[in-house]
Regions:
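Non-heme di-metal
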Residues: 1-142
């Protein structure tokens, strides 16, 4: 499948952002004392892992390697998760709302810009809704 540079770049960025999201959640779980809230965060993390692996499969299907910068996104996710965790539950939730809202804006913008297959477009639309749902969940906990 032929891929224009813009679409390839968007898919790589989506993958990188999902790598970061997984690490943010992974490092924040311990900051939540309530078992139900921790369970929600683990569920969100697993959802982001699904997004990451789906983007990995889209890249593979197009014969594209992930960006060599993905380890930087992994590290940034670790740092953001740990920093927000240092400031407690409210900081974790506020940070996650900001992260998820930004992800939703990027998904919306990239959907308009990329030349995606119908399958990719459907998944990306579903992932956009997931990001909005995560943000709403964290808002409800504040």
């Amino acid at each position: 499948m032929s891929t224009d540079r813009r679409t390839a770049g968007i898919l790589k960025k989506f993958f990188n952002l999902e790598v970061m999201a997984v690490q943010i959640y992974r490092t924040q779980v311990g900051a939540l004392a309530d078992p139900a809230e921790r369970s929600m965060m683990v569920s969100a993390m697993k959802n982001e892992e699904h997004h990451r692996e789906t983007f990995r499969s889209f890249l593979r299907a197009r014969g594209i390697s992930p960006s060599p910068q993905w380890p930087i996104y992994w590290l940034v996710g670790q740092v953001l998760g740990r920093i927000t965790s240092l400031f407690g539950r409210r900081a974790v939730l506020r940070g996650d709302i900001a992260f998820e809202d930004k992800a939703a804006r990027e998904y919306s913008a990239f959907l308009r810009e990329g030349a995606f297959t119908e399958q990719e477009r459907a998944f990306i639309g579903e992932f956009l809704e997931d990001e909005k749902k995560h943000s709403a969940n964290w808002r409800n906990l504040l």
